[in-house]
Amino acid sequence: MKNKISDFSKNLLFWSKTYNTRTMPWKGEKDPYKIWLSEIILQQTRVEQGMSYYLKFINAYPTVDKLAKAKEDEIFKMWEGLGYYSRCRNLIATAKNISENYAGLFPKEYDHLLKLKGVGPYTAAAISSFAYDLPFAVVDGNVFRILARHFGINTPIDSFVGKILFNKLAQDLLNKKQPSAYNQAIMDFGATICKPKLPLCDTCIFNKTCLAFKNNKVNILPVKETKLVKKQRYFYYLVVKFDNKFYIRKRTEKDIWQNLWEFILVEMPEKIEIEQFIKTKSFAQKVNKTAAVKNYSPFYKQQLTHQTIEGCFILINLQSPLLNNDFELVKSSNLKNLAFPRFITSYFEKNPTF
């Protein structure tokens, strides 16, 4: 097994040095702030999408101190469209923590990095190896996939036993003299060669030793123990207009889209037609007797990791203001300066003159 581990590491580094042409703006970066920022952006986000956001953030906030001092609404607006907004909340909290408690310098110790909000083992390993060249192996979906296929491991990657097994194997395989180069190589290899779908097995440097390829299990591995069950939710947004202004509020509860802005929301237990919805008590309680429905959108759908959101937008004009409500009245020209969830910005894009 020791020889197999040594050969794997050596061959992977050879591949990276000889054939790896993947370029990214943060690749080869030694600044822990920029590494951290790129890793937070890339959590649950494709590199192609994350790249432009990374460049925007670096341009606006070249240091962690600049990010820490920025207005939260401004940061959320810049994050708009990336989704998984808990990452943005963690980004803000950690930037302030580093600026205020670490004199603007990221800690070098792996255990200290793990204490930062939003930093898990993968991100801590990335910062440790790329910024400080410390021997900590990154373990993400790419690594799970490569190791499961190459070594023919059927243990579910999301099981307790599987996590221990894969983390140990990843650490054993890590080239301790070149942890930064090795970690970058295995991530690039997973993204370009050992892909989830349509992997390039015929030209892969490991196809003579890969057990999944040898046993025709490439499309089976890695194995997952749990299957994701998505919750279905139905949102009816009331785009209520009074005196050429719209009623909006910031979502503060612990739910999706926390800290983002929205119109008046009615969540229904099941989907009903809009004509039926505007006759319900739920609708009547949110508006007043002067409410006049101007128009409404078709139903939109958005897939989140654990939820499917389906909903619509109902444009309503009022002759008198709403009383005793927690909403702010904002001019339509000011809406573009606020961060809304993608579900709502899709409506803006399709209805620019609503």
Report each predicted region and the residues it spans.
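Intrinsically disordered, low-complexity, charged terminal extensions of DNA damage-control enzymes
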Residues: M1-R22, G28, A191-F354
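Catalytic cores of DNA base-excision repair glycosylases
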Residues: K2-L200, F206-N215, N219-I220, F283, ...
